[in-house]
């Protein structure tokens, strides 16, 4: 696979070999970064970040990744500061921005927006989240985090907890985990179950999938608990949100029933689904997970720019 010029829109576009290339490249770049402090692979290259939706970690880690590679960054953090506010179409925005840059990272509230941007642009486009659809770079850093912690992904029992209906991070992660020999535990309120088509695809690919609303009944089985917040902004009906708000909280009492080796992950931001008392335990790796976004996004940028 020739990576130069490639778009990163959905984890579905990746083979297992593709995923392993990204993870291995990230591992190499992390080592180089620790040794040298600053790399120069992307010197003279410009990243454009187009964030039509709020972001802290994804936007800043992409910017940090590009700077660590020796490149430059332009862009906007909210649509109100762009000509979209004047009525400019997404297609015209993309065609304009690509004149100034070598790669585009886009986050947009509408599903399919990143795919549209990739169809319009002649430079690589990386999806930083499109509505409740996909978040492929988060998935890659999640896989990197799991592999880094356990030395493997195969053979693990992984629980996905919370908003499995609207959560784009868990949609992408579940699909990627189908490439590995894992057992998946899908833990959510009935109203927020994983979409049926994803569950059916997982089972067709041979993944063992358990579904439950009772966290305590499975917590002792898990190697990884991937927690997500229940996303108020994704609900079409506020009453539906109020029915499931605060469904779960991971705290010391919950973790007392877990394996000593359990690792707790979260794509962040959190609200109240993980109590702050968990932060200082050996289980919590969500801030390590945040850091891992830098080498993984460095790897993706370097690969699609053709500089590594």
From Swiss-Prot:
UniProt binding sites for carbamoyl phosphate: 57-58, 107, 135, 138, 268-269
GO molecular function per UniProt: amino acid binding; aspartate carbamoyltransferase activity
The keyword Transferase belongs to this UniProt entry's keyword annotation: yes
EC annotation from Swiss-Prot or TrEMBL: 2.1.3.2
Pathway where it operates: Pyrimidine metabolism; UMP biosynthesis via de novo pathway; (S)-dihydroorotate from bicarbonate: step 2/3
SUPFAM superfamilies to which the protein is assigned, alphabetical: Aspartate/ornithine carbamoyltransferase (SSF53671)
Keyword list, A-Z: Pyrimidine biosynthesis, Transferase
Catalyses which reaction(s): carbamoyl phosphate + L-aspartate = N-carbamoyl-L-aspartate + phosphate + H(+)
Residues the record lists as binding L-aspartate: 86, 168, 229
Function: Catalyzes the condensation of carbamoyl phosphate and aspartate to form carbamoyl aspartate and inorganic phosphate, the committed step in the de novo pyrimidine nucleotide biosynthesis pathway.
NCBIfam families with a match to the protein in the record: asp_carb_tr (TIGR00670), PRK00856.1 (NF002032)
PANTHER family with a match to the protein in the record: ASPARTATE CARBAMOYLTRANSFERASE (PTHR45753:SF6), ORNITHINE CARBAMOYLTRANSFERASE, MITOCHONDRIAL (PTHR45753)
Similarity annotation: Belongs to the aspartate/ornithine carbamoyltransferase superfamily. ATCase family.
Protein name: Aspartate carbamoyltransferase catalytic subunit
